[in-house]
A protein has these predicted regions:
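Conserved catalytic cores of phosphodiester-cleaving nucleases, focusing on short active-site segments
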Residues: 22-48, 57-61
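Active-site metal-binding core of divalent-cation-utilizing nuclease and nuclease-like domains
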Residues: 2-34
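Metal-dependent nuclease catalytic regions and adjoining charged, substrate-binding loops involved
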Residues: 8-21, 67-134
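Short, low-complexity, polar/charged sequence segments that are solvent-exposed and flexible
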Residues: 29, 58-62, 97-100, 113
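Short alpha-helix boundary/capping segments
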Residues: 49-56, 99
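Generic detector of short, locally flexible boundary/turn motifs and exposed helical patches
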Residues: 3-7, 40-46, 94-96
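A broad structural signal for short, well-ordered beta-strand segments within beta-sheet-rich domains
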Residues: 2, 7, 36, 56, ...
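Basic, amphipathic alpha-helical patches used to engage nucleic acids or provide basic targeting signals
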Residues: 53-64, 71-75
Length: 134
C-alpha cells in the first residue's frame, strides 16, 4: 500500500486547535492513490514491537491531519521499526489500528486533569493495551 502511495509530508510540524489543541512533528505521511492520508512514525529499538505510546502518538497525528488538511485519513497508521541485528539493520513496517477521535480527546482531557493536579494518575485504557485479568 505504501509502495504505491506518494510522500505527502516528511519531518513536518503539524497542529490543530480542534477538537482540542494538539501538535506534533510527524515523521512521514503518505497519500494513497485514492487520496487517503496514512501517518507513519519510525522507531529505533532493540526489538520489533508497537507500544501504547506509539498508538497514541499516531492517533494524535491522525486527528491533527483530519482537522488541518480536511481530507480523509486512514483509521490506521504504520510504525516503522529499525532494529540492529548481527548482519545490519532490520526494518519492519507494522500496520497499527489507531484510536478514535473521541478516545484521543478523552486522553487529552485526562492528561490536562493530571497536569493540573485535579486527578491522580491511574490506568484508564480499559484493557485496550494490556490484559485486565490478573
Amino acid at each position: 500500500e505504501l509502495r504505491t502511495a506518494t510522500l505527502f509530508l516528511s519531518e513536518q510540524d503539524i497542529a490543530t486547535s480542534l477538537p482540542v489543541p494538539m501538535h506534533g512533528r510527524v515523521d512521514q505521511v503518505y497519500k494513497t492513490k485514492r487520496g487517503v492520508l496514512i501517518p507513519l512514525d519510525t522507531k529505533s529499538r532493540p526489538m520489533t514491537r508497537v507500544y501504547e505510546s506509539d498508538i497514541i502518538q499516531l492517533s494524535v497525528y491522525r486527528i491533527i491531519l483530519l482537522h488541518q488538511y480536511n481530507v480523509p485519513v486512514a483509521n490506521y497508521g504504520y510504525v516503522r521499526t529499525v532494529t540492529e541485528t548481527s548482519t545490519g539493520e532490520r526494518v519492519r513496517y507494522i500496520k497499527t489500528k489507531l484510536l478514535s477521535e473521541r478516545k484521543v480527546v478523552k486522553l487529552w482531557r485526562r492528561y490536562q486533569s493530571i497536569r493540573s493536579g485535579l486527578v491522580t494518575p491511574s490506568c484508564t485504557c480499559g484493557g485496550d493495551f494490556h490484559s485486565t485479568s490478573r
